[in-house]
């Protein structure tokens, strides 16, 4: 743990007019530091470490989807959480990725200071790079505390982002199949 991070949290408490010596706040700087390091531990990981060789030969060339992957991230503008789900698909070309690796890739990028638009693209690009897939699709739907707790204070708003690569971008049929399978299409 960075030795200066707890002191910075203590300084924040002082700037807010709080007494960091009162009973409820005595260990808050240390706890907040540990929490922030956990919430941002994606910076200490790489896609290569996560995949760890879990690519398996396969003659499957049909769509693979992992949906409803819970994600928690911090908005890079306000350091407030956004919480949602990722839906990830790819079309294999000779190899498939270990199932848990997709969720771990989502987590790695989510555990960084982010904006949802970049998070969606980073997930898609990394899965494309690792698998060499014929196409990758990522849809993320999330609620942003920076919009719910402050600013416009819209409690029921949800942000949706998508990135479509390869076959998902080039073929409306493939894209629609994915969106229908994750329950996101309107017919």
From Swiss-Prot:
Record GO biological process: one-carbon metabolic process; tetrahydrobiopterin biosynthetic process; tetrahydrofolate biosynthetic process
Gene3D superfamilies reported in the protein's UniProt record: 1.10.286.10, 3.30.1130.10
Pathway where this protein functions: Cofactor biosynthesis; 7,8-dihydroneopterin triphosphate biosynthesis; 7,8-dihydroneopterin triphosphate from GTP: step 1/1
GO molecular function: GTP binding; GTP cyclohydrolase I activity; zinc ion binding
Catalyzed reaction equations: GTP + H2O = 7,8-dihydroneopterin 3'-triphosphate + formate + H(+)
Entry-linked InterPro entries: GTP-CH-I_C/QueF (IPR043133), GTP-CH-I_N (IPR043134), GTP_CycHdrlase_I (IPR001474), GTP_CycHdrlase_I_CS (IPR018234), GTP_CycHdrlase_I_dom (IPR020602)
Alphabetical keyword list: GTP-binding, Hydrolase, Nucleotide-binding, One-carbon metabolism
One Pfam family here: GTP_cyclohydroI
A GO CC annotation given for this chain: cytoplasm
Any coiled-coil regions, as ranges: none
Top-rank taxon, per record: Bacteria
EC main group: hydrolase
EC assignment: 3.5.4.16
Family under the similarity heading: Belongs to the GTP cyclohydrolase I family.
Subunit structure as annotated in this protein's UniProt entry: Homomer.
Name recorded for this polypeptide: GTP cyclohydrolase 1 1
Gene source species: Pseudomonas syringae pv. tomato (strain ATCC BAA-871 / DC3000)
Gene coding for it: folE1
